[in-house]
A protein has these predicted regions:
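N-terminal auxiliary segments of SAM/dcSAM-dependent transferases
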Residues: 1-42
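A short glycine-rich, Lys/Arg-flanked "PGG" loop and its adjoining helix->strand segment in the class I
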Residues: 176-190
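Short, glycine-/aromatic-enriched active-site segment of Class I SAM-dependent methyltransferases
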Residues: 196-217
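Short alpha-helix
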Residues: 218-234
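Conserved alpha-helix/loop element of class I SAM-dependent methyltransferases that forms part
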Residues: 52-58, 72-91
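Conserved catalytic loop of SAM-dependent methyltransferase domains
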Residues: 239-260
């Protein structure tokens, strides 16, 4: 199913990719680490759903701990929403997590479906960490993480029943990425994307969106670009959901927590002014 693991030179082909890999190799933000320590699932995405009001009740000295646990619950809920849209997955199917971070969503997918999951990342640190998590859980024979480029994964054509990207497409050319996903998906296969995208209706990107780009060393795409790239690569949307309103409570909670990074205000500003959307796109390979 897999090929020889490529060298760093083959994986990181541009100066931009090298800078992104370096960022994530060095990244140890408490907002990712402390939340993962709650139950051992390490996410690199944001949360969805209403905040449990009990977080703000109880002793002040344990309030931040309650906030950490609640943010982690909301991030896990986001991954569940993504997995809900992968369609009918059998234990014999193979899935791909493109931009797999520290492995949380891949591990959840295996737990839910019992199938094989491969994750790819250009961060060697993330790959090593995620493989360690799979080994600790005794699922390393079913869940594997690879130091590879999602634009050229090396996996066999039509080998995947479903693929997802969870807040990773802002690091790649959409036409190249969706071309690779189209190659990997079997006919009728499912692609699910959750992403932040700029609002074409507003014209040029806002100051808040530009600050998000600068913070994460990424390139947020306009909403229209996603649908152009999908259409060009035989990926036909079946469901599009604006999750913006559902993620705002998470960001408002995070802004009050001890793990706030300073990017919370730009996110909240961009969401509330309408220049930025949190979108889920579900598409089938035809």
């Amino acid at each position: 199913m897999t090929t020889t693991v490529p060298s760093a030179t083959n994986v990181l082909r541009t100066a931009f990719q090298k800078s992104v890999a370096n960022y994530w190799n060095l990244e140890k933000d408490p907002v990712n680490i402390k939340l993962g320590e709650v139950d051992g699932l390490y996410h690199h995405h944001y949360g969805l759903g209403p905040v449990d009001p009990s977080v703000f009740e109880g002793p002040d000295e344990t309030r931040d701990e309650r906030m950490i646990k609640e943010m982690h619950r909301l991030e896990t809920a986001q991954a569940d929403v993504l997995l809900d849209h992968l369609g009918d997955i059998a234990p014999t199917d193979a899935l791909l997590d493109a931009g797999s971070g520290r492995g949380g969503t891949s591990i959840m997918a295996n737990h839910r479906f019992g199938c094989e999951v491969d994750g790819v990342s250009i961060s060697e640190q993330q790959v090593a960490f995620a493989n360690g998590q799979a080994h600790e859980r005794g699922i390393a024979d079913r869940v594997r993480f690879h130091f590879r480029n999602m634009l050229d994964t090396g996996f066999q054509t039509a080998s995947r029943r479903a693929i997802w990207t969870n807040e990773t497409t802002m690091y790649v050319d959409l036409f190249e990425a969706f071309g690779e996903f189209s190659r990997l998906l079997a006919p009728g296969g499912r692609y699910v994307c959750i992403t932040g995208c700029s609002n074409d209706v507003m014209g040029l990107r806002s100051k808040a969106v530009s600050r998000i780009d600068e913070h994460y060393i990424c390139n947020i795409h306009p909403r229209s670009q996603y649908f152009k790239a999908l259409a060009a690569n035989n990926l036909v949307p079946i469901n599009v959901v604006d999750l913006t309103a559902d993620t705002i409570p998470y960001w408002e909670l995070r802004a009050q927590s001890s793990v706030a990074t300073g990017i919370e205000d730009p996110f909240l500003t961009a969401y509330k002014e309408g220049s930025f959307h949190y979108l889920m796109i579900v598409a089938d390979r035809v």
